[in-house]
């Protein structure tokens, strides 16, 4: 119904005033509804255009599935597919010497061309970015990590993967992975070592006739975040290479990304090197302690040895059981030898002191008995024959007849007398070189004066000076036998007041240490020419000097040998 007809109908049915009111209300309502209808028309037109765009993109994606077989690689039967690879390392979480592996989180991107996915270029749709669901509908390289031990694909909050399809058919696939890969390590210079760990990329089934891998951006294909850090290591740099691997099933293309790590020395200096060095220094304290303080020195030596043993055990417990020697083993082993040598040094000092003390006691006993014997002779009392095989030997001064003028004598060596079962006769006093020496007892006895340790015999020293008597035989000195007397008679040299033997033979009849007691006094406190105190004095200098020299050689050699940088390494922070 038109507006004029509606107006005529209302005019016939309603009064004129009311008719005008209704007409104005109707006109006003039409004016209000006009903008709304215009907006609805505009929205409808816009919606129609957007829908057209959706239809075009969907049509492109749907067209990929027409006569497309994802089981067949691109250019099947033709040239191999070139797959470009790039990596960007986000973080490296661990590097284990025990497990020989390392864990890293990185973006892994692959680039290849599939002509079957090319489409006509349209404005605004040169590249299509689609979700990970689309990957199930197309062919993708069967890439895997050769030295992978464990991998993790991130799915929070959605699958961390996307696909980009270029209108020319170029495909870009990007995923985020966390991989634990094996890393064989050489711990010969541990803890000053540098390790080179790598990730190897290869096709699992396609040989080089089907797929060839390459670094897509040349030397800049691998990137490492500057925020990568490890507690015990620093990332020195990385390098990349492409190789061809020959297996029984054919030749395969392989890419390798190598990352070099430098171990930080701070932990090992604080926890191992400095404590072990201080333990060695503590072991030197025993050199300044009195050698008679046996409990203190033994306790100190044993404690340092056990502490070094514990430190070595705890250090090696955190490392793999390897057969070769590490640099830290050299240091700890040397420290252990040093503290053990300190303990043996006190054992040597104690042994020498004991031997010297025993010699002093024997000398004092012999000297005391000799003085008693001389006193009896001065009193005119002739001692009865000694039933013991051991007899006493006296050192007298100038004497005449059987009388002696005793002089104080130092310690004399050990004397041993052995009997010879042939009669008895008393030796007379002999004045030799102005000194009197009387040996009272059976003449058929052998008197031995033990001066030095038996080991001195190997050095040409005099072990024993022997005065032999028997059958009138002369005393035997260091120069050979003296004059012989008749059997059963008095010894050569006369009776009670006879003259002594002349010349060198007279002095040879008596041991030299009896003629020169001062020399005996000088050497009685030494063993092998040194005293126990000398050993402590020498040790106070020798041990520190040896340890300082060892440290200088150790740190200079190992720091120089271990400072090796891999060839063609791109240092961290120098990537272009």
UniProtKB/Swiss-Prot annotation:
UniProt cross-references to Gene3D superfamilies, sorted A to Z: Neurotransmitter-gated ion-channel ligand-binding domain, Neurotransmitter-gated ion-channel transmembrane domain
GO molecular function: benzodiazepine receptor activity; chloride channel activity; extracellular ligand-gated monoatomic ion channel activity; GABA-A receptor activity; ligand-gated monoatomic anion channel activity
GO cellular component: chloride channel complex; postsynaptic membrane; synaptic vesicle membrane
Membrane topology category: Multi-pass membrane protein
Ranges in coiled-coil conformation: none
Leader sequence residues: 1-29
Keywords: Cell membrane, Chloride, Chloride channel, Disulfide bond, Glycoprotein, Ion channel, Ion transport, Ligand-gated ion channel, Membrane, Postsynaptic cell membrane, Receptor, Signal, Synapse, Transmembrane, Transmembrane helix, Transport
Any single biological process term in GO: gamma-aminobutyric acid signaling pathway
PROSITE patterns (UniProt xref): NEUROTR_ION_CHANNEL (PS00236)
Compositionally skewed regions (Basic residues) per UniProt: 398-412
UniProt feature, compositional bias: Pro residues: 475-490
Covalent S-S links between cysteines: 183-197
Segments on the Cytoplasmic face: 351-540
Glycosylation sites noted in the Swiss-Prot or TrEMBL record: 56, 251
Record field: transmembrane: 269-289, 298-320, 330-350, 541-561
Membrane-side (Extracellular) residue stretches: 30-268
CDD domains, sorted: LGIC_ECD_GABAR_RDL-like (cd19008), LGIC_TM_anion (cd19049)
Note: Flies carrying the Rdl-S mutation are resistant to dieldrin.
Quaternary context: Homomultimer.
Main function: GABA, an inhibitory neurotransmitter, mediates neuronal inhibition by binding to the GABA receptor and opening an integral chloride channel.
Name by which UniProt lists this protein: Gamma-aminobutyric acid receptor subunit beta
Gene that produces this protein: Rdl
